[in-house]
């Protein structure tokens, strides 16, 4: 056997070994990307939450037992490409370490929750960031998202031995931002000046009318004339005149 034949014989066990290592550490990839709920739903995007469709039927062929957890991975968009599935879910994967890790795990479920093909009248959704009461340090906390994003999410199925399967990353998700009122340059300033001028003129007119009314009222209620005062001083009642007539008689 020549030297090339010997090299081929030596390479075969090495290739088999590499194949076994890769298959043992690789994750099953599920050809599914998480989707935002339809645009017609009010509140699917807010300043701190977003709403996903449930991955119904996506884990039915995965080698999992029913109690095995399926997590939702929430990541900063720029950290998604560097994400490595943890061998075990720990406290460091809670939202408190979101900025340091670039991701956190939340909304623990199992494939029983995500069974598909069953008629259901209820709208089955996942509301990310909808829990204001959980501790940021606790595993699975679904706390409000800290900013507008962008974010990416994926589902990660795990067993007691470690990660088993994962979906694709979603598209970038941007949350709503608070809108600040800004005056339109030029046009709104001129309109404001016109309104202020009109109100000033109206106020001046009302003030003049008020002064005229006050002056008129003062003139009409001024003191009586001297003639009226004389008449009032010499006025005697009928009763007093009768008494004087009786005395003179």
From Swiss-Prot:
Places the protein is found: Membrane
Task: Tell me which InterPro entries the record gives.
Answer: Haem_peroxidase_sf, Uroplakin-3
Q: Name one GO cellular component term.
A: membrane
UniProt keyword Signal present: yes
Task: Kindly report every residue range on the membrane side named Extracellular.
Answer: 27-194
Q: Which residues are glycosylated?
A: 63, 82, 133
Q: Name one GO molecular function term.
A: peroxidase activity
- Where does the signal peptide begin and end? 1-26
- Provide the membrane-side ranges marked Cytoplasmic in the record: 216-249
**Any one of the GO BP annotations:** response to oxidative stress
The reply to whether Membrane figures as a keyword in the UniProt entry is yes
Q: How does it sit in the membrane?
A: Single-pass type I membrane protein
- The residue ranges crossing the membrane are 195-215
- What's the main place this protein lives? membrane
Keywords from UniProt, A to Z, are: Glycoprotein, Membrane, Signal, Transmembrane, Transmembrane helix
Q: Which family does it belong to?
A: Belongs to the uroplakin-3 family.
Q: Which PANTHER family match?
A: UROPLAKIN III (PTHR15446), UROPLAKIN-3B-LIKE PROTEIN 1-RELATED (PTHR15446:SF2)
Protein name listed in UniProt: Uroplakin-3b-like protein 1
Species name for this entry?
A: Mus musculus
């Amino acid at each position: 056997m020549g030297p090339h034949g010997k090299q081929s014989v030596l390479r075969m066990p090495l290739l088999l070994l590499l194949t076994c290592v890769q298959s043992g550490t690789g994750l099953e990839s599920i050809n599914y990307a998480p989707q935002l709920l339809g645009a017609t739903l009010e509140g699917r995007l807010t300043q701190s939450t977003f709403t996903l469709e449930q991955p119904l039927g996506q884990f039915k062929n995965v080698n999992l037992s029913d109690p095995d957890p399926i997590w939702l991975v929430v990541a900063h968009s720029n950290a998604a490409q560097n994400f490595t599935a943890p061998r075990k879910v720990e406290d460091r994967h809670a939202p408190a370490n979101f900025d340091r890790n670039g991701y956190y795990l939340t909304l623990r479920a199992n494939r029983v929750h995500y069974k598909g093909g069953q008629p259901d009248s209820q709208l089955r959704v996942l509301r990310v960031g909808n829990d204001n009461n959980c501790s940021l340090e606790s595993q699975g906390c679904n706390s409000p998202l800290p900013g507008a994003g962008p974010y990416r999410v994926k589902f990660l199925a795990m067993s007691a031995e470690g990660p088993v399967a994962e979906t694709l990353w979603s598209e970038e998700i941007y949350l709503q931002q608070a809108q600040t009122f800004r005056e339109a340059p030029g046009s709104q300033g001129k309109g404001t000046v016109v309104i202020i001028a009109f109100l000033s003129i109206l106020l001046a007119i009302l003030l003049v009318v008020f002064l005229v009314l006050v002056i008129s009222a003062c003139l009409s209620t001024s003191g009586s004339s001297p003639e009226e005062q004389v008449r009032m001083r010499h006025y005697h009642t009928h009763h007093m005149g009768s008494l004087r007539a009786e005395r003179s008689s």
